[in-house]
Regions:
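Short, well-formed alpha-helical segments that are part of the catalytic scaffolds
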Residues: 2-20
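Short hydrophobic beta-strand elements that form part
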Residues: 1-2, 25
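The conserved acidic donor/metal-binding loop of glycosyltransferases
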Residues: 69, 75-79
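Short, well-ordered alpha-helix to beta-strand connector turns
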Residues: 21-22, 43, 68
Length: 260
């Protein structure tokens, strides 16, 4: 499954990298470039939907249209390395044979403007659910928190090889403008989504968030390895998390007043 909007520069590499799949579903969110024509060259199914804040809201629907039990979900700015594709193909039966396994994680390498990130909350040795069983894995319409294993199921992980080549390349952001615009869009629903999944915060936590979130990204998760880029990304992360927590706190206050 893949969801896209005006991604003609990124789509070819992404779709070519999943050429080993036999049932590709592409959903377009109103692209005005050549995205749909590109998708027609690779995808067996194409859908058109109105724009939404995040792709989870589309995947919730489309996952039910897929013919296979095991499904790959990938973003237009992601590319499956040939080494990873070969490993998935060769180990597919082994990886999916256990009845309690609902999802398989793969090594996930972030890039900012084609620069490999070695630290921050995004970079370093990251992992992502990539191949999942649609009967054992949940796709809920919740920004950042909608994709998770169903109760009683576990995951398995494809380990990073010595050459660090068997990765899902994530060409995450190609400009600061796109980076800021996307995260502003995510913030629209971040507070209410956190509230709906049971997350709660306090005024004290909101006040301390800038310090703790910057420290976590820049020092704990080694954002300093990325130099000035790591500093600015960590500062942005601190702002984003603080904004999301403040939104959540305001919603909590509103709900408390309504309950009186």
């Amino acid at each position: 499954m893949i969801v896209g909007f005006n991604e003609e520069e990124l789509l070819p590499a992404c779709l070519q990298s999943i050429g080993f799949c036999n049932d590709i579903h592409y959903t377009d969110l109103g692209s005005t470039d050549g995205s749909v024509k590109i998708a027609e060259q690779f995808a067996q199914h194409i859908y058109h939907r109105a724009p939404v804040p995040s792709c989870e809201m589309i995947q919730t629907e489309v996952v039910h249209y897929t013919k296979n039990d095991w499904v790959i979900f990938i973003d237009p700015d992601e590319v499956v390395d040939e080494t990873l594709a070969t490993e998935i193909i060769n180990r597919f039966d082994e990886l999916t044979s256990q009845p309690q396994v609902g999802g398989i994680k793969v090594p996930w390498q972030f890039y900012f403007k084609r620069t490999r990130l070695r630290g921050t909350v995004w970079g370093g040795k990251n992992q992502k659910f990539f191949l999942v069983n649609k009967h054992r894995f949940a796709f809920d319409p919740v920004v950042h928190y909608g994709r998770k294993l169903k109760p009683a199921f576990t995951s398995t992980t494809i380990a990073l090889n010595k050459g660090e080549t068997n990765v899902l390349h994530h060409y995450w952001m190609n400009s600061w403008q796109v980076f800021i615009r996307k995260h502003r869009r995510y913030l629209i629903n971040e507070g209410i989504d956190r509230y709906n999944i049971g997350t709660r915060t306090s005024f004290k936590e909101v006040l301390l968030a800038p310090y703790y979130e910057f420290k976590r990204s820049f020092w704990t998760l080694k954002g300093y390895k990325d130099g000035i880029l790591g500093f600015f990304l960590s500062a942005f992360w601190a702002w984003y998390q603080t904004s999301a927590m403040l939104s959540l706190y305001k919603i909590q206050q509103q709900k408390a007043l309504q309950a009186k």
